[in-house]
Amino acid sequence: MQTEVSQFAAFIGIDWADRKHDVCLQVAGSDTRETSILEHRPAAIDAWAKALRHRFGGRPIAVCLELADGPIVSAILEHDFFTLFPVNPSTLAGYRKTFTPSGAKDDPTDAAIALELLRRHPEKLKPLHRENDDMRSLRRLVEARRDLVHDRVRVTNRLIFTLKSYFPQILDWFRDKETEVFAAFIERWPSLQDAQRARHDTIVAFFHAHNVRRASVVDRRAQAMKSEVPLTSDPAVIEPARHIVAALLPQLRALSAGIVSLDSEIAIRCRALPDYHLFAELPGAGEVFASRLLAAFGEQRDRFANAAAFQKYVGIAPVTERSGNKHWVHWRWACPRFLRQTFVEWVASSIPHSFWARAFYDSHKAKGASHNATIRALAFKWIRILFRCWIDRTPHNESRYLAALQKRHSPILKFAAQDPS
């Protein structure tokens, strides 16, 4: 615990839930523990906090719970005399097993265990420091954007599946199924028969109205519409499918509009943060990955002792286990999945845009490593580089890094020399 224990007037363990929170409180210098139940209502939490402020004269109070974000955390941090010490749920579960080997779980007991962990092992816990509003907003926005993208993929896949049952030709005419021109075309001509009844000039005017003006593309699509043969003329297939498509199109449009709106807000937040330039020019990052990487690193540079600690936190560093003569290495399961996904996705995107990343990838593939294993290894390498850039507040320089590899006679350069680009 980075904060001196002696400064706290009381210590609190909380086992949070959706509707109520179990609380276990111990006054500093006392062995007596007080248990209570706190309703999850803003007024109840506020009244509880004000009562504690009055009772202890506004002196600092330490609070331990297995959560670093969420409604209860936001409510607690509204009061400046609380110092929050979040603990990993797996850590608390392991500590619980020390006292209950049977695996029994009880909410009031969990609150007491959180308090016990706070009192007996303060050196294992770090206080939660609230980052500035823009950084905290950015972190929520980029994760929400990824969720909307996932939802859009799900809706698009359902739309494609439905179109394949009666109107598969349209899937060949439009490569990008998430565009407004694709949605507008289906809305106007929801079947091949409808499209074939349209005049050539009407088709051309439609594409021009949606900024598709290349004559070869428009003519090819218009001719294909007239020459294609319907997959089926069965109304029992076509009519239900048309209704399903009509139900999916508004969802697709709403999700696309939501993503555009979030992109605008994310851009505003990024421009307000001084570290954005460290990630904006990374190979293959673009605005989407740059904002996610910025949110992943945050602004608290004393939070991680070194790059290895950060690699473990985001789930890129593997886990090594030993038992007797056995030794095995496996994927790290307990980690923030979105952060790990951020690095895995960006690293894959960096390969076509980074000379050394391409060489690193090719060298590992030449050794027989799988694509996924190679991406994880490359992510491990990239994080070490980015961590140093983040600590030093210096953007990554590809030429400088290549010169460093050459100075160390890195074997990666052999593959870099063979790169056809």
Residue locations for each model-derived region?
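A detector of single, family-specific signature residues
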Residues: M1-S421
